[in-house]
Amino acid sequence: MEPIRFYRPQDPHGCCSNYSLHAVTADGVTFLTSEHYYQWAKHITVDPAYAETIRLAPTPGKAWRLANDRAHPQRTDWEQIKDDVMRLVVLHKFVQHEDCRREILATGDRMLIEASPRDAYWGEGADRTGRNMLGMILMEVRGVLREDAALQEQIDGASSGMHEDALANLPSPAAEYERQVRARLATAK
C-alpha cells in the first residue's frame, strides 16, 4: 500500500500539517493552529507572557520562529515531553474538526509520512530516513478516532435502552487517550 506523504497545508492531506488553519482549543485557550499550541507549550511554564506572544503570532511559521528564539529559554524538560504535547494537540485538532477527522479516517491503514525536507525528527528529512514522529502520532490518533467511531456506532445501534445507557457511560477511546497523555505530562513536571 502506497504511503501518504503530506507537508504543506494546501496540498492533499493538508489537514495532517500542523500549519493547517484549523484552530485548536486546549487547556481552555484557543490557538490559530496546532503549531501555535505546540510552540506555546515550550514556554508557558517558564515565561507565560512570552508564551502568549507565541500564541498570538499571525502565522504558524512566526510562532515557530518566536518559540525557537534562543533569547527566550524553553522549559527544561521539553525533550522529555514534546512527543506527548504533540499527541495532545493532534488529538484535539482531529476531535474538534470533523473535516480533518473524516480525512484522516479515510486514509485507512496507509502509512502517513510528513515529507519535510528539513526535519528528520518530526518528518522523514531530506534523505527520507527520518523518524517521522508526526506521522507516527497521526497514525496513533487515527486508531483512537477509529475506536471512537466504532463505539459511537455501537451506541447508535443499541436496541435496548439499558444496553445503550451502559455503552454511553463508557469513556470514549479519545477521552481515555487524552487522560493517559495528560497523566504522563503531569508526572514529567
What label would you give each PLM region?
Residues 1-189:
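Charged, low-complexity intrinsically disordered segments
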